């Protein structure tokens, strides 16, 4: 019998309307544009997602301001992040791709790549729908793994193949895991992360620079400001509450931090009335 529990690990749909919803938290979104286009903001930047483009989003909550054309058609496969980890080939290339997709989730595919990618999507769907197959979960895992390998190949073709040493990959993975867990809310010094990873701050910065092209400080501040931006949009906390939530030494320092990285004061975003609560 098929493993019925697998149905909560993969969701296949023709819409991106729920990509930023709580329902999809913990899922990776893989979307292939069949026709039309969509405009959206991600990670604080504006992107276009058009015909024959592939989009891979690790954190759907960072997607905002979606504007979808009337002729937009898309095939979407949401996969539980833990299941993706089980399916991902033992290759350090995944780290390079993960960092690149965090900065730009859209990959432009040529005709041959699009045809192959569409075949991969249909392959996953076929295995997902074949409930009576004895090796149901294993077959889906293989289909997803093949799709991921093609993603790696697309990325290497478009952006160049550069390998990362196993040691660098392990440390970078642990560093990003700490940021994913929200450590930046209480710790924004490189020395803290370096100490937790049992390396020097200089070595951690060197690893970040070589694997991602950005410093450790960049990633710490990037995660911090994206989280702050999300709370500012929701307007669920006051100015002082947000300063405390992110463990800033004072509201004044919090204000300067937001001004520096967002180009606006938090009081303007939250509103004067909110600040006086």
Regions found by a protein language model. Name each.
Residues 1-53:
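Generic protein-terminus/edge-of-domain signal
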Residues 39-41, 62-70:
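Short beta-strand His + acidic residue motifs that chelate non-heme Fe in jelly-roll/DSBH
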Residues 52, 204, 253-254, 258:
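Short hydrophobic/aromatic patch on the recognition helix
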Residues 68-129:
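A hydrophobic/aromatic-rich effector-binding and dimerization subdomain
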Residues 210-249, 271-277:
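Terminal helix-turn-helix DNA-binding modules in bacterial transcription factors
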